């Protein structure tokens, strides 16, 4: 079986700031846009998280939770420099590196001869090198498949690692909450719970045909992940073509005001994701998706190089008026298409 490592830096942007200014180390700190400009939080250190401050949160809300919060606008050049150094450390062990953003990546070390071929020791060495060379901490997950490696990297945060061996996959999955599977949000989790499905072990006993009936193509993903199946390869030349967020509603909505409020909420999350994945390059298009109660959907796009909430609201309002035809809306999504494949390739090759 393969040996996959998922490395995730610990509160990366904030950690770089605390490293460069030790006075920030023990106080609540966040990186993000100002509350006066209706900004959002990109990341927060652990003292701030104890107050409930988290990424994608409106900055104004963060200050309500933690009035003494120190807010910095961020220094993307410093974060990119650190990311490049981290990427160089990864490359000492394998060429099979799939960056997900500035602060996390998958590594396939199946054929690496380092550390006697032990993925556990390789992950430990990588984390030690990051600590000694950059004075930053990273967490890691080690597993034979990608999604379990990612889940494992969260289990001993911060500054730890967790291993799932091939023999441990089935015992681990038995009690694993379905909410841990990427793509299972709050609404999907509630729908699963209504069917009596809370853990991967329960999915293993559930007919695939029923999952397909209730969840469409995603039903197969649920079934495969719950059985420990994830055949996705590590993609060193992975090109991210778009960034998007969407929400399936527990109940259909019929009034524009509800849709507008949801778009306001989704916009904050989209802005945060885009900043993390693509901090300084322009976008090509931005758009809105509405899915109706009959499962038909419409997607409207607008060519514009900068993410703009007013434009997205205008696009959505036009789609609402022109395409809805009195139908209830069950899903709302926002997305941006990234500028150019060559620029995107350079972004990933340069690790930011």
UniProtKB/Swiss-Prot annotation:
The UniProt record lists the UmuC domain at: 4-185
Q: What is its EC number?
A: 2.7.7.7
What's the protein called, per UniProt? DNA polymerase IV
- Quaternary structure and interacting proteins, as annotated: Monomer.
Establish whether keyword Transferase is in the entry: yes
Which SUPFAM superfamilies does its entry note? DNA/RNA polymerases, Lesion bypass DNA polymerase (Y-family), little finger domain
State a single Gene Ontology molecular function.
damaged DNA binding
Cofactor mode of binding and number, as noted: Binds 2 magnesium ions per subunit.
């Amino acid at each position: 079986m393969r040996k996959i490592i998922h490395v995730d830096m610990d509160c990366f942007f904030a950690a770089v700031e605390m490293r460069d200014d030790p006075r920030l180390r023990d106080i609540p700190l966040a990186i993000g846009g100002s509350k006066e400009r209706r900004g959002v939080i990109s990341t927060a250190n652990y003292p701030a998280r104890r107050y409930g401050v988290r990424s994608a949160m409106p900055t104004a809300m963060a200050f309500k939770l933690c009035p003494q919060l120190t807010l910095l606008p961020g220094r993307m050049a410093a974060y990119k420099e650190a990311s490049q150094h981290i990427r160089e450390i990864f490359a000492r062990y394998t060429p099979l590196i799939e960056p997900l953003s500035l602060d996390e990546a998958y590594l396939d070390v199946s054929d690496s001869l380092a550390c006697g071929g032990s993925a556990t020791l390789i992950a430990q060495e990588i984390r030690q090198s990051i600590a000694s060379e950059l004075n930053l901490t990273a967490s890691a997950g080690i597993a034979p498949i990608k999604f379990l490696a990612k889940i494992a990297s969260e289990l001993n945060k911060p500054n730890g690692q967790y291993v799932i061996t091939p023999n441990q996959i089935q015992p681990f999955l038995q009690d694993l909450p379905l909410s841990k599977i990427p793509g299972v949000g709050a609404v999907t989790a509630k729908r699963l719970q209504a069917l009596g499905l809370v853990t991967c072990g329960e999915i293993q006993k559930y007919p695939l045909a029923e999952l397909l009936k209730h969840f469409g193509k995603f039903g197969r993903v649920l079934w495969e992940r719950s059985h420990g199946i994830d055949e996705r390869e590590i993609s060193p030349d992975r090109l991210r073509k778009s960034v998007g967020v969407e929400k399936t509603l527990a109940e259909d909505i019929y009034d524009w005001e509800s849709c507008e409020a949801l778009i306001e909420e989704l916009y904050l999350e989209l802005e945060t994701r885009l900043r993390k994945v693509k901090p300084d390059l322009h976008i090509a298009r931005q758009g809105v998706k509405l899915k109706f109660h009959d499962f038909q959907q419409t997607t409207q796009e607008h060519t514009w190089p900068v993410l703009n909430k007013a434009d997205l609201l205008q696009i959505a309002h036009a789609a609402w008026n022109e395409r809805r035809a009195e139908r209830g809306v069950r899903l709302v999504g926002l997305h941006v298409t990234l500028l150019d494949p060559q620029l995107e390739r350079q972004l990933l090759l340069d690790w930011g």
